[in-house]
From Swiss-Prot:
Gene giving rise to this polypeptide: mnmA
Predominant subcellular localization, coarse grouping: cytoplasm
Protein name: tRNA-specific 2-thiouridylase MnmA
Compartment annotation: Cytoplasm
MF-aspect GO terms: ATP binding; tRNA binding; tRNA-uridine 2-sulfurtransferase activity
Top EC group: transferase
Length: 371
């Protein structure tokens, strides 16, 4: 009986290209696929010269992925997920900002597109496993029967923060071949295999937001939809209620932001919170950003079954990707999908809409969304 192929999600970058080449060298049957997610032509006022699609799925990226597939001798397909991407990633991204929260589109994309719709496409080519260029590790715990998610060996490239929504069913079918490698090793492998993308740089920004200007993207997107963004100036106020100035929309601000406030008091000011209902942006000093804890909602447990009432779990908690995980207690609530996070020491800029990911060493216990 022929071996089932492995479907590799190829972005046209170095990491996924090395994954495809590694698997071929191991003698595995591989099929390459690139996901078409967003067409930049829809919003011409934001178009970047020479680009017709989002940064992670531009025509250049498709061309690069196809070249690598031809190099390593595997079938290659482009699959169009633009409709699903807009529904599950772009629209929630816009809605969250308008609601005064700061979203993580990469996590939504992982949950609903890369590890959901893509697996459906893997089924269509007879593949059980999919492989990606993510820096993370998976192992199966024989004692509990659970698939566990672990940090990558290269902590500087670790992407587990964006993977906290993966289910047991998704983890069972996923391979992360780069989890035991560091980025320089991957670059060296790309060069040694003479891959066409060996010298290609890494993408940094949100793939569908040109130049990282999310406020401009939102305005253009809502204009296309015929929705008027509430641009009426609101107040910028201090934590004690003093009005310092006005702004052009709460969706332009996020907790912890310092630049672009347009007001000054002689002391550094930061966004403490936003209130879309009354169009207020609340600002204050650095100490006003400190929080002793928060509630995480829609919690997805990965490496453990959950937190039991009366039995808090110790963990290190990350509240954004570049945050150094902080020691905390996870306390059960009456709702299993919610957890109270109590830090040992107050943390700065706990931001509604961001992810909270719970770690025990390298092990990802689970994660949820900051309320």
């Amino acid at each position: 009986m022929p071996e089932q192929p492995i479907a590799v999600a190829m972005s046209g970058g170095v990491d996924s290209s090395v994954v495809a080449a590694m698997l071929v060298r191991e003698g595995r049957t591989v099929v390459g696929m690139t996901m078409q997610l967003w067409n930049q032509r829809r919003l011409p006022e934001l178009a970047v010269e020479g680009a017709t699609t989002g940064r992670c799925c531009s025509l250049d990226d498709v061309y690069d992925a196809r070249r690598v597939a031809e190099q390593v001798g595997i079938p290659y397909y482009v699959v169009n997920f633009e409709e699903q991407f807009e529904e599950h990633v772009v629209k929630p991204f816009v809605d969250e900002y308008l609601a005064g929260r700061t979203p993580i589109p990469c996590t939504l994309c992982n949950n609903y597109i890369k590890f959901d719709r893509f697996l459906e496409m893997a089924d269509s080519v007879g593949a059980y496993h999919m492989a990606t260029g993510h820096y993370a590790r998976i192992r199966h715990d024989e004692a509990t029967g659970r698939y566990q998610l672990l940090r990558a060996v290269d902590d500087s490239k670790d992407q587990t923060y964006f993977l906290f929504g993966l289910t047991q069913a998704q983890l069972a079918r996923t391979l992360f071949p780069l989890g035991e490698l560091n980025k320089p090793e991957v670059r060296d492998m790309a060069r040694s295999m003479d891959l066409a993308v060996a010298a290609k740089g890494d993408s940094q920004e949100i793939c569908f937001v040109p130049n990282g200007d999310y406020a401009a993207f939102m305005s253009a997107y809502l204009k296309e939809k015929g929705v008027a963004v509430e641009e009426t100036s609101g107040e910028i106020v201090t934590t004690d209620g003093r009005t310092l100035g006005r702004h052009e929309g709460v969706h332009r601000f996020t907790v912890g932001q310092r630049k672009g406030l347009g007001v000054a008091t002689g002391e550094p000011l930061y966004v403490i919170s936003t209130n879309p209902a009354n169009h207020q942006v609340v600002v204050g000093g650095n100490d006003d950003l400190l929080r002793g804890g928060f509630t995480a909602k829609d919690v997805n447990w990965i490496s453990i079954a959950g937190v039991e009432p009366g039995a808090p779990v110790r963990a290190q908690v990350k509240i954004r990707n570049r945050h150094a995980a902080a020691p905390a207690r996870l306390v059960a609530t009456s709702d299993r999908d919610r957890v109270e996070v109590v830090f040992d020491e107050a943390q700065r800029a706990v931001t509604p809409g961001q992810g909270a990911v719970f770690y025990a060493g390298d092990l990802v216990l689970g994660g949820g969304w900051i309320e």
